[in-house]
Design a protein with these regions (language model features):
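Transmembrane beta-strand segments of outer-membrane beta-barrel domains in Gram-negative
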Residues: 1-8, 15, 71-73, 77-175
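Transmembrane beta-strand segments that form the barrel wall of outer-membrane beta-barrel proteins
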Residues: 1-6, 13-15, 20, 24-38, ...
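Feature captures outer-membrane beta-barrel proteins of Gram-negative bacteria and organelles
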Residues: 12-20, 36-58, 67-69, 109-113, ...
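Short loop/turn motifs that connect adjacent beta-strands in outer-membrane beta-barrel proteins
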Residues: 22-26, 52-64, 117-123, 166-174
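Composition- and surface-driven signal marking solvent-exposed, interaction-prone regions
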Residues: 27-33, 43-46, 124-126, 137-139
């Protein structure tokens, strides 16, 4: 895919993923992207192990997998709220220039399990480092208005869910 933004300039991206046709337990996906303006490579890699044998993807019901991912990319502050990938052809079109962006390093470990009775557990651990880029600055709220070079966060999450009798619809395709 070819897109553009304030920091990357013209951006070239190539993505790929495996399915259960390669291995019914191990799944890999990722991308590499290069910006002509900042001349930096960006990338993401994800490895998922499904504890149950999958027909096509690791997120088939009932899910039971562990996943690890690492990403280095440039993002606008709003990109983390997107339900889809920021390089989606419809999201990549902007009506105004977004010049406040950041380089993000994000390492995530995720576990998810669903049962046939409607109970599910999801756990997540994340370490993230945001370094401002473009016209974005992180400024400490002190008298000197100190410029902060980056913001590093760590996050843990646990979700328990019980939805007895829940039904799912899916589209089945011959692949």
């Amino acid at each position: 895919m070819i897109s553009s933004n304030y920091v990357d300039g013209t951006r070239f991206r190539l993505s790929g993923m495996t399915t259960a046709k390669l291995n019914p337990h191990w799944f890999f996906n990722g991308y590499g992207a290069y910006g002509l303006k900042d001349k930096k490579w960006k990338y993401e890699g994800n490895v998922t192990y499904s504890f149950r044998k999958c027909e096509f993807f690791p997120w088939e019901f009932p899910k039971h997998y562990i996943s690890a991912s690492y990403r280095y990319d440039v993002m606008s502050p709003m990109d983390k709220f997107l339900d889809t990938d920021k390089d989606n052809v419809f999201v990549a079109w902007k009506t105004t220039t977004v010049d406040q962006m950041s380089y993000v390093r994000d390492a995530t470990l995720r576990y998810e399990m669903e049962t046939l009775s409607g109970f599910s557990v999801a756990a997540m651990a994340r370490h993230r480092k945001d370094t401002p880029a473009g016209k974005l600055q992180y400024i400490r709220n002190d008298a000197a208005k100190t410029i902060v070079p980056d913001i590093t966060t760590a996050e843990l999450g646990l979700t328990l869910r019980y939805a007895p009798g829940e039904t799912f619809g899916s589209i089945v395709t011959d692949v």
